[in-house]
Swiss-Prot record:
It holds the Pfam family DUF3461. HAMAP family: UPF0325. InterPro entries: UPF0325. It comes from Aeromonas hydrophila subsp. hydrophila (strain ATCC 7966 / DSM 30187 / BCRC 13018 / CCUG 14551 / JCM 1027 / KCTC 2358 / NCIMB 9240 / NCTC 8049). This is UPF0325 protein AHA_1169. Belongs to the UPF0325 family. Signal peptide: none annotated.
Length: 127
């Protein structure tokens, strides 16, 4: 049972508390939160990055116009199904306050960009 989660290295799937799933560029980011253990200030979490699958779809058959679209990775679908099973479909929901969500997304983007800049600078120093 829960073979997909076990293949990710999660030995005790019943310790999963919740999860979040977000899209970042051409990847889906899955973050799994575990139940907090006694004596811990924060619950443990793990993060996984899945590339989105690309498909070319026919938009207009008359003009034979095609459009590239992306969709969730097939393996990730199975993992999310198992997580929904474990959490009874209760995962961290989007905030009703859209302004706060946008601000959080913006702060996260700032961190991602800063980390990428640092990585590029380190690569430049190696040259």
């Amino acid at each position: 049972m829960y073979e997909n989660l076990k293949s990710l290295g999660i030995q005790e799937p019943t310790s999963v508390d919740s999860y979040t799933l977000r899209q970042e560029a051409n990847h889906d980011i899955l973050k799994i939160y575990f139940k907090k253990q006694k004596g811990e200030f924060f619950a443990k979490s793990v993060k996984f990055k899945y590339p989105r699958q690309r498909k070319t779809m026919l938009v207009d058959s008359g003009t034979h116009e095609y459009k590239d679209v992306t969709e969730i990775n097939a393996n990730l679908k199975y993992v999310v199904d198992e997580l929904d099973n474990l959490t009874q479909g209760v995962h961290v929901q989007a905030d009703p306050d859209i302004k706060q969500k946008i601000l959080r997304d913006l702060r996260h983007l700032e961190k991602v960009v800063q980390n990428k800049i640092s990585e590029i600078e380190r690569d430049l120093e190696k040259l």
